Amino acid sequence: MPPGDSQGRDEWIGNKQRCRSGIHALRLRDFQTGCSDQQRSLIERTPEGLYCPAADAWIDPLRPVPRALITHAHADHARPGNGEYWAVDSSEGILRQRLGREITLHAMPYGKSFRLNQANISFHSAGHVLGSAQIRLEVNGEVWVVTGDYKRDDDPSCAPFELVPCDVLITEATFAMPIYRWKSGEAVATEIRNWWQGDRNRPSLLFCYSFGKAQRLLAELHAIGVEEEVLLHGAVETVTRHYRQAAIPMTPSRPVSELPRKESLAGRLVLAPPSAHRSAWMRRFQSPQTAFASGWMAVRGARRRRGYERGFVLSDHADWQGLLKTVRQSGASKVYVTHGQSDVFSRYLRESEGIDAEPLSKLTDINQPDSELTI
């Protein structure tokens, strides 16, 4: 345990970080010289997250590290406290807003290769949200791709998914079950328009994730010809500004907070994050109709359990067919599966597709527990 006084604690933390840095330096040296006890994998699991020894960098690290390769700006992938960040240039505004203006960020365009130590790295569109990327890593002619979160469906709010051939694929599996098959964004936007305009006597509150889903809804509504102003919760507005700066075509919008408190909101469509549902913020809306837009609305009973009147199935992740198509088209001889239904999907790939696949948990684990780092 660290000392109780602040000076001693700072020294203890500093020593621990230096110790960790020394361990990572040894890992890189082992990769460069081949001095390890076993052949090194191009990517390994560590307590800090996925680690590429040849680059001496981590992908979407779980803990602060010297070098972080970021797939996209969602909070479960981009965390504060890292020494340097590499990410797609179109994600820069949101990353700095969420992680701090002062972060050291190397903003890269899609497709441009750069070198970190012994690895050649490039970012390729994942089609998930603005600035989302798959990460391609090449070492000595061997290519691995980490998809991060991705989808294969058309989405007017971000760059489309790019297929990246590879030897080894690490794919997400959030919706890796046959029940998950998405309609087009246009079809869902039409359902939403009809729901909203079918009851002009009440406000229509549509709950959705504030980064990615909300902006996609605005873009999908614009694509089907909706030009009536949509009102936004503050958390949605903050992110939407970055999409407008990126010239994403979306239906007009403004923050609810800009309207006079006594103005009637009957007949208006309002986008808000799930955290606002049943909160004090909702007191402003008289007898609203409510709905939630998410891939999870495909699960029977999910809408009712969450307390919404209506559910719209719209996801920014690949559905069952999209996942299968990606694995097949990648040409990968080895597939690791992470997030969601990793056991189910990897087993299906082995037994039905004849593909060498297993959960990411089976990937080489370079485990260095904190107890071994105690000073």
Segments the model singles out, each with a brief description of its role:
Residues 20-31, 256-375:
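C-terminal regulatory/interaction regions
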Residues 42-58, 245-268, 272-282:
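A short, well-structured beta->alpha microelement
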Residues 84-92, 170, 228-239, 292:
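Short internal beta-strands
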Residues 12, 18, 27-35, 162-163, ...:
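Binuclear metal-ion centers of metallo-dependent hydrolases, dominated by the metallo-beta-lactamase
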Residues 78, 132, 154-155, 214-218, ...:
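Short, well-ordered alpha-helical microsegments
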Residues 127-139, 150, 154-155, 161, ...:
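Active-site-proximal loop/helix segment associated with metal-binding centers of metalloenzymes
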Residues 37-54, 58-63, 67, 73-212, ...:
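His/Asp/Glu-rich metal-coordinating catalytic cores
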